[in-house]
């Protein structure tokens, strides 16, 4: 998907025309219109939003902020997931339901209990998580799915960084 210059749904549909299955993605809504696709959300994106909302300064011994609690829920999921790496996809699927589903249920319950200011960093994190909820548990459906799309993003990073560097190169050799 990284080869497309635009995020128009038509370009995604043309690229994925006969594909049926799971697509790991960030919060881009264009994937929602594709038929035969199960969108798998990225917990690293939700975690990042909560990290961005953590206050820069906090008194020693102060209770955890809501942003820290949100980040900690995400960290717990990643910690559990790390322990499941060596399992077969079938066993990973079973263990996720056993170990991660209760954490997810607690996270969503906690998230719904929050009242936040929409424009604040915490408000943005909470709104993003709430909006992505329909896709965030889809990784539980198949042990081959990942909890994040970090691997894909790391694979395309050289091209996304290079895109600006190559902007004024007139030939591939000049780039």
Where are these regions (language model features)?
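Catalytic center-proximal scaffold of phosphoryl-transfer enzymes
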Residues: 1-175
């Amino acid at each position: 998907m990284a080869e497309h210059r635009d995020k128009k749904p038509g370009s995604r549909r043309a690229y994925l025309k006969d594909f049926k299955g799971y697509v790991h993605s960030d919060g881009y809504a264009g994937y929602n219109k594709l038929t035969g696709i199960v969108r798998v959300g990225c917990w690293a994106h939700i975690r990042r939003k909560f990290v961005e909302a953590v206050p820069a300064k906090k008194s020693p011994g102060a209770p955890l902020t809501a942003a820290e609690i949100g980040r900690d829920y995400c960290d717990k999921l990643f910690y559990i997931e790390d322990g499941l790496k060596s399992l077969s996809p079938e066993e990973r699927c079973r263990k996720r339901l056993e170990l991660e589903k209760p954490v997810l249920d607690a996270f969503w319950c906690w998230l719904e209990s929050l009242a936040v200011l929409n424009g604040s960093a915490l408000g943005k994190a909470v709104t993003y998580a709430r909006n992505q909820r329909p896709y965030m548990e889809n990784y539980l459906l198949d042990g081959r799915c990942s909890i994040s799309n970090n691997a894909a993003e790391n694979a395309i990073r050289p091209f996304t960084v290079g895109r600006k560097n190559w902007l004024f190169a007139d030939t591939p050799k000049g780039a």
